């Protein structure tokens, strides 16, 4: 059973109840303090490598043998389940395999309904005559990319991409963006960049979408102009400048792209069905489909994010009927928490509404109907959280594990990628590794209709992968280099950063000191960081605390720790080391019980604990405003640059002590492997010198 990650459901409720360690995890000074705490203290405390395919003939023999031995699959009746009420423990094994909020069982979600061949004509599926005027020219991206690519050119590009031979170009764009584009190196002189897209008029959309697209997206603005050309040209895209303000426009644009792709794929298959039936030509060869029906996959962090995507889709695809729409809304949507009015905008967007991170749903498009909760093998589009999808792919019963429904996905859209990092990135990696593998069973496939690049196990070189993230990390960069193989090109767009240090929400200047430590490799970073902290920074901190006459006034040190593993290491050191015997401290993380968090925050504010250890994931899920902070030590810089301003802003929560706190300031550790984080914090112009500077390893900004 896949590990849920973080012990969190949605934004982090229901943390794991763990047995306490064999040592003291916190230490309290016995000093006089007021019983009646400021209400503000507790106001928010309740809150596998790519598998190589078999040769074509062996694949046909294997799948045909399985099909013949089993005989025709029978129809199976869906099993209905009552909706479940109440909160369930995230680690409860039953939750992983049970039905949540009216979803089908795992077996039912994967069960096929015969006939289920991708090309089978279902009543009302598509009206071929209605779209007879939608025939596209050969240079239209859908045609040149999927339907009728130049086989010789495609083969050359696949060979170059498989050998990791890419030619690239980079440029600064209007709006403060940097672009890096790569294409397979087949002897071209240069790597062209596409012009910004001012409107959707140049996009070849299906006629049934055109009027809604024209009405609802009259023009494109901001960074959407720069990203859209590559998305509609079916290139791989890593966009690292996602913002809350442009998220709706980006979501609508992607919804048009995904829906348009589904409709074009289905209409082409069904028109060819009619052609085969009419001509009765045994030599007619029509390669127009994949092994299985699903063509688009969305990976999203929460159910409410799924609702927003579906709302965007139905703005443009407006069928006469939407089957099970009410059931979908009841199970996936919820109202925002009114107590979050003072939370940051990005927090409200991510966690507003239904923040459950365990879901999956299939959508099927027909001419007059959009069907919700369709079984995966009869779905055109799948929306899921990484946890929800992995649960069905990686079941405890090996015989029930299945990922064939991902074998023919042609467009993958991952939104809120940075939020998925805070859940469990291993789930995302697992899913990406299982995309476009050749299926283990036939699933009713007509192999005479399957496109040759599917049969040759080259689908990953044609598939489009789109990632939207507020910032880029090494893990996200790894997806760009490991899973983005699109032979028509791949692009990375990143902002040019001014630096979070210049945008602090404080009335007075704050001393911000950055200390670089040497490290030979990324794997040795944790040990080098720990050694530098305990020998240099902690010794000074302990001396200041233990030699002060007033322990309460000497306290107020917040230690911010991005990694949970580093947090455990530091917490254990504070609890057991002779160096910190006389230092009172508290430690709170994403796994800490709410009551313990409240106690630690109150002890820290009143001076009973001089030091508070605080993790990045806890801040991500709760966005606490910690009072009593007089100085900040960043054991590592946050991935999210917004967090820098919020954490440093703790220094100004007590107006009477803001000047003293500003003098205490911030001290942050970094190594050369923190380059991406450092760029977001200090700015693109400063980061190079700080990483290469030979004259010193300490840098101070006011």
Swiss-Prot record:
Biased composition (Acidic residues): 31-49, 88-107, 114-138
Biased composition annotated in UniProt, kind: Basic residues: 10-20, 72-81
Localization, UniProt: Nucleus, Nucleolus
Residue ranges crossing the lipid bilayer per the database entry: none
Residues covered by region (Disordered): 1-157
Keyword vocabulary terms for this entry: Nucleus, Ribonucleoprotein, Ribosome biogenesis, rRNA processing
GO terms of biological process kind: maturation of SSU-rRNA from tricistronic rRNA transcript (SSU-rRNA, 5.8S rRNA, LSU-rRNA)
Region forming the signal peptide: none
Pfam families with a match to the protein in the record: Utp25_C, UTP25_NTPase-like
Example GO molecular function: U3 snoRNA binding
Record's GO cellular component terms: nucleolus; small-subunit processome
Domain of life: Eukaryota
Location, primary (coarse class): nucleus
Family: Belongs to the UTP25 family.
Complex and partners: Component of the ribosomal small subunit (SSU) processome composed of at least 40 protein subunits and snoRNA U3.
Purpose: DEAD-box RNA helicase-like protein required for pre-18S rRNA processing, specifically at sites A0, A1, and A2.
Protein name: U3 small nucleolar RNA-associated protein 25
Source organism of this protein record: Emericella nidulans (strain FGSC A4 / ATCC 38163 / CBS 112.46 / NRRL 194 / M139)
